[in-house]
Amino acid sequence: LRYIEMDSPIAFRGLEDLSGTAVLVERLGEKMYRELVERRAAAIITIASNKWYQADADLLPTEMRPNYLKWGALPTFTVRPYDAAAMLRDGAATLRLELRQRSYTATSHNVVAVVEGTEPTDEWVAVTAHYDSTSITPGAWDNGSGTAAVMGLYRHFLNHPPRRNMRFIWCGSEEQGLLGSRAYVRAHQELLPSCRMCFNFDMCGSILGNNEISFIGPAALETMVRQVCDEAGFPSNVDAYVDSSDSAPFACAGVPVVCPSRGHWTSQEMHTRHDTLDTISPQKLHEMVAFSTALIGFFVNAPDFPIAREIPADAAATLEKRFGPAVP
């Protein structure tokens, strides 16, 4: 057994051949996985999460995504942080590992509703949320809350048609690697040049925490989002960063994105059996939908679309590094 904390050249110095070695890693990114395949590691042991240091912490099944498997297949296991620390503390040197797995093909669906605008235009705005969860969790916060928020927004704009067209997309299989949103972007290349923005909702309405709005787009976008927050009396952090959610494939295709959410380190129960409805505040979810109605309305009802359809070069480079080419 060998513990490799990170995928830096220094951490791998002198470890050109890991044959017969099970490698314990803090986080299994694609770069780390590729290094271990190329160095012929016998197996990989990932740590469930460094946030949950309990002996009974939930364990998610290990799922290998296609972008990992293109480098080769390695037996991969997951242990709790409690057990990982115990192995290192006790000086475990030899392990016996037994792998039980099943391979299967499943079908996932996106659910799409279109609201046609009142003015003749090809321009449209996407509103997205993933409706799936992980296999061990009820998924109230992640992402039943975002699913419900988009339904509330759909009902509003269905009854109050906007100037521009809108597509409400409930994406499947986000937790398996943004598969639903990637498939949608890949299948609708002819529509994307007319897509002016994407608003994505992933985890909203938690009782504890604060509102967060991440965005990727031209500099003017931040000013406009802050303006709507101020006018609506909606306190929120507003920051430019790349979020790993269904907005990413749209951003990779050059579409500016805005991602309202709500949460805090005290409410990090996603991907566990504790992600239940009692962590959700109907009032906070309603406030998010009311604010987002105003925010989206600011853009879809403007006489001329307020921002350019562009992604800053530095953000585009980060997107390509994390998520791959523009057509995922």
Q: PLM features: residue spans?
A:
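Structural recognition of the beta-strand scaffold that forms the well-ordered cores
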Residues: 3, 22-25, 43-46, 76-78, ...
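Soluble non-cytosolic domains of exported or imported proteins
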Residues: 26-31, 78, 140-148, 160, ...
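Metal-dependent peptidase/peptidase-like ectodomains
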Residues: 76, 135, 162, 171-269
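His/Asp/Glu-rich mid-to-C-terminal helical/loop segments that flank catalytic regions of hydrolases
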Residues: 155, 267-328
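Extracellular/luminal Protease-associated
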Residues: 1-75, 236
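Solvent-exposed loop/turn segments at secondary-structure junctions
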Residues: 28-31, 49-53, 83-84, 102-105, ...
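Soluble metallo-hydrolase cores and metallopeptidase-like ectodomains found primarily
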Residues: 1-10, 62-140, 152-155, 159, ...
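Second-shell loop/turn segments in exported
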Residues: 3, 20-27, 32, 72-74, ...
